[in-house]
Amino acid sequence: MKKIGVLAIQGAVDEHIQMIESAGALAFKVKHSNDLAGLDGLVLPGGESTTMRKIMKRYDLMEPVKAFAKEGKAIFGTCAGLVLLSKEIEGGEESLGLLDATAIRNGFGRQKESFEAELSVDVFDAPTFEAIFIRAPYLIEPSDEVTVLATIDGKIVAAKQANILVTAFHPELTNDNRWMRYFLEKIL
């Protein structure tokens, strides 16, 4: 059975663990770099990307997560996870640099502009996915290596590149585990 870690420093950690288990994998909380050993994949949950980056640096997780990805291990970033995984963040903040695109933090506005929307996602059997956007980012300037999986109003809100999958929204806050199944079956 596949073993997936969830970076447990902020965000909907328990919801991601439930989603991983509902998709048929084992889930583990990751708080330290040695927690990455033996994992097949890692989820970087939503939260506040600047705070998450600071905590990752304090606990010496930035370089181990980069090394994890460079070993070919899969990473799924949601919301703030998308921001952290992007090659660049508008405004010049440090990132993991693993997805060749630029992230626009809070691209859809602040907390009061949070919303739900139906997305068309060609990689799923069902026609739409109900997505929850909370202070959501989006991507711009993806390289040719990046495959866009979903957009809303022309803004990229889901993408993949090699062993990296990102969503600007929070699939873990729904009862629909298709994004996690996609991660386990197609990205891992």
From Swiss-Prot:
Q: Which SUPFAM superfamilies match?
A: Class I glutamine amidotransferase-like
Example GO molecular function: pyridoxal 5'-phosphate synthase (glutamine hydrolysing) activity
Which keywords, in A-to-Z order, does the entry hold?
Answer: Glutamine amidotransferase, Hydrolase, Lyase, Pyridoxal phosphate
Q: Which GO terms describe its cellular component?
A: cytosol; glutaminase complex
Pathway terms, separated by semicolons: Cofactor biosynthesis; pyridoxal 5'-phosphate biosynthesis
Q: Does the keyword Endoplasmic reticulum apply?
A: no
Chain sites annotated for binding L-glutamine: G47, E48, S49, R105, I134, R135
Q: Which residues are annotated as active site?
A: C79 (nucleophile), H170 (charge relay system), E172 (charge relay system)
Enzyme Commission number(s) of this protein? 4.3.3.6, 3.5.1.2
Keyword check for Amino-acid biosynthesis, yes or no. Answer: no
Q: Where are the transmembrane segments?
A: none
Q: Which BP terms in the Gene Ontology apply to this protein?
A: glutamine catabolic process; pyridoxal phosphate biosynthetic process; pyridoxine metabolic process
Q: Which Pfam families match?
A: SNO
> Known InterPro entries for this protein?
Class_I_gatase-like (IPR029062), PdxT/SNO (IPR002161), PdxT/SNO_CS (IPR021196)
Classification via Gene3D superfamilies: 3.40.50.880
What reaction is this protein's catalytic activity? aldehydo-D-ribose 5-phosphate + D-glyceraldehyde 3-phosphate + L-glutamine = pyridoxal 5'-phosphate + L-glutamate + phosphate + 3 H2O + H(+); L-glutamine + H2O = L-glutamate + NH4(+)
Q: Which PANTHER family match?
A: PYRIDOXAL 5'-PHOSPHATE SYNTHASE SUBUNIT SNO, PYRIDOXAL 5'-PHOSPHATE SYNTHASE SUBUNIT SNO1-RELATED
**What is stated as this protein's family in its record?**
Belongs to the glutaminase PdxT/SNO family.
Self-association or partners: how does it assemble? In the presence of PdxS, forms a dodecamer of heterodimers. Only shows activity in the heterodimer.
What does the UniProt record say this protein does? Answer: Catalyzes the hydrolysis of glutamine to glutamate and ammonia as part of the biosynthesis of pyridoxal 5'-phosphate. The resulting ammonia molecule is channeled to the active site of PdxS.
Q: Mind telling me what this protein is named?
A: Pyridoxal 5'-phosphate synthase subunit PdxT
Origin organism lineage? Bacteria, Bacillati, Bacillota, Bacilli, Bacillales
